[in-house]
Amino acid sequence: MRPLTDEETKAMFEKLSKYIGENIKLLVDRPDGTYCFRLHNDRVYYVSERILKLATNIARDKLVSLGTCFGKFTKTHKFRLHVTALDYLAPYAKYKVWVKPGAEQSFLYGNHVLKSGLGRITENTSQYQGVVVYSMADIPLGFGVAAKSTQECRKLDPMAIVVFHQADVGEYIRHEDTLT
């Protein structure tokens, strides 16, 4: 487990800023302690420094996971967020989308959000902006990328895609063997 390089940190923070903006600093400087990001097997983990010090006694090849996995770097060195980061992204999300109860299941199966399933959307959401998807009961379901801006959504036909699917809580079941 090692600290991220400058290039890796930049790629990860650019991806996180699409979803939570300048609230990234709230992830690192928390009132309950200092947290940091560490890389292990191409996966980025979010862990408190107190637990990180305890993990130094474990051999690197024996360590499977530590803290919360925020995402991983692909072979082309792009950062991809995992659904395990949802609990940390949702409270700080700048742009949100609420889906109707009938569209929740479709989203949780890995499909995009259609206009017919859109309940609400945050004002001034621009196209290709990172959004957190909520149920109408304000339960975070996953995250995605806005396919259309808020103004364009008002004029769309019901079968048009509004949010491109990125990750959802259904992945805990669909990919339980590969999530760490």
UniProtKB/Swiss-Prot annotation:
Monomer. Interacts with pre-ribosome complex. May bind to RNA. Interacts with NOL8. Interacts with FTSJ3. It is found in: Nucleus, Nucleolus. One of its GO terms (molecular function) is RNA binding. Residues 93-180 are annotated as: C-terminal domain. Its main location: nucleus. GO terms for biological process: ribosome assembly. One of its GO terms (cellular component) is nucleolus. Keywords: Nucleus, Ribosome biogenesis, RNA-binding. CDD domains: Nip7_N_euk, PUA_Nip7-like. The keyword Cell membrane does not apply. Pfam families: pre-PUA_NIP7 (PF17833), UPF0113 (PF03657). This is 60S ribosome subunit biogenesis protein NIP7 homolog. Residues 94-170 form the PUA domain. Belongs to the NIP7 family. Required for proper 34S pre-rRNA processing and 60S ribosome subunit assembly. Residues 1-92 are annotated as: N-terminal domain. InterPro entries: NIP7_N, Nip7_N_euk, PUA, PUA-like_sf, PUA_sf, Ribosomal_synth_fac_NIP7, UPF0113_PUA.
